Amino acid sequence: MDKRDLYDSFGEMEQQMQQMLDKMAKLRADMTTVLEKNAELVIENEHLREHMVEIENELPKKAASTTTLSKSRQNLEKLYDEGFHVCNQFYGKRRDDDESCVFCLEVIYGERERA
């Protein structure tokens, strides 16, 4: 191997090493991006789990509050189920074909402020 071939071999090796360094730098940048995205997703996942737990804890409270009607509202519900209006507008009138009445439902299930 003469000096020129040796010099050319070193030049080729230098180019290959530079290409390897460039690939390594790109891989490092890509890996950093993936790790950052993964960390963001882990945090978002934790927040979503916490939010789910909060919602699940609220559901039984809402269900319990809607199922506990006072005695008078239970009586109104019974009349309504038998086909009569219990709202102020049509109180005591029969509901045609058992259609729903928004006013009656508000009287029975609506939330009222207590003074």
From Swiss-Prot:
Disulfide bonds: none
Subcellular location field: Cytoplasm, Nucleoid
Record InterPro entries: YabA (IPR010377)
Cofactor-binding details, from the entry: Binds 1 zinc ion per subunit.
Primary subcellular site in the record, as a coarse category: cytoplasm
Any single GO CC term annotated in Swiss-Prot or TrEMBL for this entry: nucleoid
Keywords of the record: Cytoplasm, DNA replication, DNA replication inhibitor, Metal-binding, Zinc
Cofactor: Zn(2+)
UniProt-listed GO biological process terms: DNA replication
UniProt-annotated binding residues for Zn(2+): H85, C87, C101, C104
Stored Pfam families: YabA
Similarity annotation: Belongs to the YabA family.
Subunit structure: Homotetramer. Interacts with both DnaA and DnaN, acting as a bridge between these two proteins.
Stated role: Involved in control of chromosome replication initiation. Inhibits the cooperative binding of DnaA to the oriC region, thus negatively regulating initiation of chromosome replication. Inhibits the ability of DnaA-ATP to form a helix on DNA; does not disassemble preformed DnaA-DNA helices. Decreases the residence time of DnaA on the chromosome at its binding sites (oriC, replication forks and promoter-binding sites). Tethers DnaA to the replication machinery via the DNA polymerase beta sliding clamp subunit (dnaN).
Descriptive protein name: Replication initiation control protein YabA
Lineage: Bacteria, Bacillati, Bacillota, Bacilli, Lactobacillales
